[in-house]
Amino acid sequence: METKGYHSRPEGLDMERRWGQVSQPVDRPSLGPAERTEENNYMEIVNVSCVSGAIPNNSTQGSSKEKQELLPCLQQDNTQSGILTSEIKTELEPKELSATVAESMGLYMDSVREADYAFEQHAQQGSLSPAKIYQNVEQLMKFYKENGHRSSTLSNVSRPSRSFLPDPGSAVNGGVMRAMVKSPILCHEKSPSVCSPLNMTSSVCSPAGINSVSSTTVRFGSFPVHSPITQGTPLTCSPTVDNRGSRSHSPAHASNVGSPLSSPLSSMKSPISSPPSHCSVKSPVSSPNNVTLRSCVSSPANINNSRCSVSSPSKANNRSTLSSPAASTVGSICSPNAFSYPASGASVGSSATRDVIPSPDTHEKGAHEVPFPKTEEVENAISNGVTGQLNIVQYIKPEPDGAFSSSCLGGNSKIHSDSPFSSVPIKQESTKHSCSGASFKGNPTVNPFPFMDGSYFSFMDDKDYYSLSGILGPPVPGFEGNCEGTGFPMGIKQEPDYGIYYPEASIPSSAIVGVNSGGQSFHYRIGAQGTISLSRSARDQSFQHLSSFPPVNTLVESWKSHGDLSARKIDGYPVLEYIPENVSSSTLRSVSTGSSRPSKICLVCGDGASGCHYGVVTCGSCKVFFKRAVEGQHNYLCAGRNDCIIDKIRRKNCPACRLQKCLQAGMNLGARKSKKLGKLKGLHEEQPQQPPPPQSPEEGTTYIAPAKEPSVNTALVPQLSSISRALTPSPVMVLENIEPEIVYAGYDSSKPDTAENLLSTLNRLAGKQMIQVVKWAKVLPGFKNLPLEDQITLIQYSRMCLSSFALSWRSYKHTNSQFFYFAPDLVFNEEKMHQSAMYELCQGMHQISLQFVRLQFTFEEYTFMEVLLLLSTIPKDGLKSQAAFEEMRANYIKELRKMVTKCPNNSGQSWQGFYQLTKFLDSMHDLVSDLLEFCFYTFRELQALKVEFPAMLVEIISDQLPKVESGNAKPLYFHRK
C-alpha cells in the first residue's frame, strides 16, 4: 500500500541544510533499463514478510543459519506493477559504512544537544551517552559483517491472517516499554500512517520481522513522547538504547534526529540513501526497497513505518519508533499477510495509551479507504519484566462498511468487567462478541417497563385499568436500557417505587385513579372543593359499582399515616371531600365540567348565547339586531353575493347576510308572544278542569272552565280561581298555540343551484309542510266536527293556497318581504328566483308578501286568515256536511271581525280594515291558480324534468289534478268580481 510521511519536527529543516553539505559515496545496485531514470519518483507497494520470533539482545554471536531465519525474505513480485526492484544489494562496505555512520552520529549529537532543552524536564532516567550509542553501532556493524552478502527480496506471498506476540523473554536488560499497534490505516500526505500492500494490520516490519506502529504513547524512563499524529508517542524502542528524539537510522547503524537522508538521485540534498530510493521532499533515509515517506527512514528491506517510525537492520536505538532485527520489545510482531486487526503488542509498564485515533483527514487519491475503529482505552499490564497476559478493557465500534470480520486485541486477551482499569463505554454495540477471543460481559438489559404488582390496579368488575401506560401511551418501541434500583431509563419520567407510598396490602384496588382507554376519568381537584368526575362508557348502564369506592378521606389518611412520606409527594394531594354513594351521574358530570366554557352558543354568529330569543338560541347582540332590522323595516343590501361569513368578529360587516342568517336560524318576532302564552298555558293547566259542557254551534267555541277545588298552589295564590277565569284561552290564543312548526328544507348547498335541484328541494319542503298542515287541521277547533271526506277535500283544495300564504308571512316576518323565506335553510334571493325557472310566479308571491308590509298584519290576523283560507275552496257539488262547514266558516269570520274592531290601531276604521283583509283573501285565489298550473305541469313532466316529488305530495296531486282540471273546484270569494 502507498505510504507517505509527514515531517512535523521543525529541526528537520535545519538538519536538511546540514546534511546537504555531506557527501558520501554510496553503492547503488543495478537497476533495470527502464528503472534507472530519476523520474521514477512514485510510491512503491511492498508486502512485508515478518518472522514471529524476536532476536535477543545477545544473539549477535549466533550461527549464520539462525540469523538467516530471523531475517525477512524480501522477494520481488513481478506481477505487481508497483515494485521496481529486482535484486537488492543490502550490504555496504565496512569502511564506507563506518565512515558514514561516524559522520552521521557526529551531526546527530549536535542536533541532540540543540534539542536537549525540550527534554530536560523529562529526562530523568532515559538519557544515553554517546559512548553507549557507539557501542550499539559497533554491535550493529558486527551483525552486518556476519550477515553480509545476503540479498533480500520483496515478497508478497499471501498468508493467513494472524498476529504475533513477542516472546516473553524478549524484554532485554529489564527495559520497560509500552506500545500499542493500531492498523490498518491509509497513508496520506498530510497525516501518513503505514499500511501494507494488502491492508495489513502491522504498520512496519524490520528485517527481523518486528513491527511497530506510531501514534501511541511510549514511556521512556519517566516521560512519554508523543508522535505528531495522535498525541501519543511512536511506538517501540530498543531495550538497550533509549535515545532521545532519534527519528531515522541509516542502513548501517546511524541515528539521526529528523534529518532527511536521501540518495544522490533524490531531489533532496541529504547524502545517504539506498540506490533505488526516490524520496519525496523532506523524506528521510530510504533503503533500497524503501517506500518513501516524508518523515520515515527504513532499513534496506524495510517497509516504511509511520511518521516517526524507523526500521533499522541493526539494533540502533530510537526513542520514537524502532524495529530492530536483533532484539526488540515492540508491541506486536506481524507477518506480511497478518491482516488481523488491530495488532496489539505486549507492553512493559503500567501506564495507559490514550486516544489512539488515526488522523481524520487522510484520504489519498486512488487509495482504498479502510475504516479504523476508535479505541477508547487500553490497559496493558506486564509484571516482572516479562510480557504477560493482556488485560484490555476496550470498546470498539467498527464502521458499517468495514472489511474486518473481527477485531482482535490479542489471542489470549479477555475482558474483565471487574478490572481496576475498566473504563466506562461510550458506545456499546449489541453484538455478542466485539473481539475474537474476548467477550464483553456487561450488565444485562432489563425491560424498562416492567409490570409491577401494586402499581396497576383494576378499577371495576369490567377490568378497566387505570395505569401509567394508559396515561403516557405505549412504551417506546425498541427501547433498551438498564433499570437498577430506583433509576429509570430516559424513555419516560417514572417515579421511584416506594413501598411505603403504595402499600400493596393496605390500599384497595380502586385507589389509583387516572384515565383509561375506555374514556373513564377520575379527577382530584386541588383544594377543599375536591370532586370526582366519572364518565362511564356506553356499555355501562348504571353506576352500580360506584358504592365500591372507598371514602377519599380514608385514602388520604392512609397516605398520611406514613411519617417518612416526603412533603413533595403530599403537596399534590390535598384533603378531598367525601363523595356520597348515591350520587347521580348527571351531578358528577355537571360538577366536573364546570362553567369554563359556555354550554350554548349563538346559532347566528357563534358567540356565547345569552338565552332563547325570538325562538332561537342567540346572543344579545343578534337579538337586538334582529329586532331592529325587522321592526325598522330596513332594506339591507349585500355588497357581495349574499354569502358573507357571519361570525363573532365579522357579524357587523354585512347586515343583509346577518339578517338572512337570523332568518335561516328560525328567528321570528311572533315567537316572543308564543313563549308568553306558553307560560300562561302551563299555569292554567295546573288547575284541574272538568270536560267542557256540550255546546251548540250558536254558542260558539269560547267558554270559561268552572273553578274547582284549589290545588296545592292555592296556598300561594289565594285568588287563583278568579285569575283562571280571566286566563281562559280565547280562540286567538288557541290558534297561536296550534300554529304549525317551521320545518327545514334540507337544502344541500354543495350541489349546483340548477332548476331541477331547486324544484326538487321545494317539493320535498312542501311535503314536510303538508304533514304539519294536516296536524294543524286536526286540532283546529270545529274542524273535527266535519266528516273525514270533507276534511280531506278541504285540505287537498287549499294546499297550495295555505303554503303560499304561509310563505308570504314568513318572508314578511323574517326578511321584511325582501327575500323568500321558504325555510330557515332555504331563502331565495333574486338570483335563485331566476335559477328556479319560476321567476314570474315568485314575483306574484312577492307582491302578496308586500301586502303584508303595507297592511301591517298581526299574528292574530294571520292565524284567522289562515283558517279562512282552509275553508275557501270546496267542490262544486258541495261537501257532505255543508251546513256544518258553513257554520264553522261563519264563526271564524265573526271572530276575525271582532278582533279587527277591538284592535286599538283600527279604531274608527275597523270596517275598512276588515274589508282590506277580505280583499286580500280573494286575491290569493288568482295567485294559486297560476301556482297550481305550474305544479301540475312539473308533475306531468317529472320524468323529463328530473324533478322529485315526495310520496304524500304525489298522492295529493294525483287526487287533486283531475278535479281541478275538470273545473270541479269552487273558490269562495268575499267580494263579487
Swiss-Prot record:
Zinc-finger as UniProt keyword: yes
GO cellular component: cytoplasm; nucleus
Protein name (Swiss-Prot/TrEMBL): Mineralocorticoid receptor
Species, as recorded: Tupaia belangeri (Common tree shrew)
Keyword field contains DNA-binding: yes
Protein family per UniProt: Belongs to the nuclear hormone receptor family. NR3 subfamily.
Zinc finger (NR C4-type): 602-622, 638-662
Localisation per UniProt entry: Cytoplasm; Nucleus
Keywords annotated in UniProt: Cytoplasm, DNA-binding, Lipid-binding, Metal-binding, Nucleus, Phosphoprotein, Receptor, Steroid-binding, Transcription, Transcription regulation, Zinc, Zinc-finger
SMART domains: HOLI, ZnF_C4
Region ranges (Modulating): 1-601
